[in-house]
Amino acid sequence: MEPREAGQHAGAADGAQEDVAFNLVILSLTEGLGLGGLLGNGAVLWLLSSNVYRNPFAIYLLDVACADLIFLGCHMVAIIPDLLQGRLDFPGFVQTSLATLRFFCYIVGLSLLVAVSVEQCLAALFPAWYSCRRPRHLTTCVCALTWACCLLLHLLLSGACTQFFGEPSRHLCRTLWLVAAVLLAVLCCTMCGASLMLLLQVERGPQRPPPRGFPTLILLAVLLFLFCGLPFGIYWLSRNLLWHIPHYFYHFSFLTAAVYCAAKPVVYFCLGSAQGRRLPLRLVLQRALGDEAELGAVRETSRRGLVDIAA
């Protein structure tokens, strides 16, 4: 081998080693963020399901936390073979199950975020109509319908693109993934439109302090999705529709997806925290949800208790 060719081979080997090291760093960060996200979403799920007063928007966040929890669990398990550099490999049906379950939870979380954005926008634009005419069980029905529709799409994709229910159909599989791509685009546009209208309504509202709680939470969650959650959806659709994407986008989208799911509980607790005061997590989450009436009742009860003790 000539010296020039030897140098080229050595340079290629060094570049490959650097790529492997970089990918390992990204995957390790993804695992760490996923673990933090599991703890954060687990805390949100526990607080919303047991201790915190359930306003309509709390039910949305309860379902979002559940979807994120399942997504992160599958996400962390799915990247273990890449992290261990081929020393461990899952059977094909396990890899397929993890992949389809991740996309299912991703679409559920996005659909719920769209639903809560639209409902918060309606509450800001038409407060009188919303408070008087809103169906009592609207949130529960929307959440149940979202899970059911996403499950139907999940089963159709599994039946057409995998061997779970028989021989896969390439034509039907590609058609369903195109439907999923259109669905993702429609959901993103609807969410952005509702969030923009909500932002304009908050800015143009009467002369009063802007709401620190739930509207701000929704706007931050939407921004978080656009910058961190959307790359995973783009990667997943491109992969299944056989569109060309850069190789580095694979690990990048996995990292940003972990950031997206792990950062949402941080946003909840940061928005609900009181500057200069340490509050229980239950009250912090209530403040983020805008349960001012419930918080007032809690404070009044606390004051009465102190008075009774003093007496």
From Swiss-Prot:
Keywords: Cell membrane, G-protein coupled receptor, Membrane, Receptor, Transducer, Transmembrane, Transmembrane helix. Coiled coil: none annotated. One of its GO terms (cellular component) is plasma membrane. SUPFAM superfamilies: Family A G protein-coupled receptor-like. Residues 1-25, 85-95, 158-177, 238-251 are extracellular. The keyword Transmembrane helix applies. The chain crosses the membrane at residues 26-46, 64-84, 96-116, 137-157, 178-198, 217-237, 252-272. Residues 47-63, 117-136, 199-216, 273-311 are cytoplasmic. One of its GO terms (molecular function) is G protein-coupled receptor activity. It comes from the Eukaryota. Its main location: membrane. Pfam families: 7tm_1 (PF00001). It is found in: Cell membrane. It is a multi-pass membrane protein. Orphan receptor. May regulate nociceptor function and/or development, including the sensation or modulation of pain. Belongs to the G-protein coupled receptor 1 family. Mas subfamily. This is Mas-related G-protein coupled receptor member E. It comes from Macaca fascicularis (Crab-eating macaque). The gene is MRGPRE.
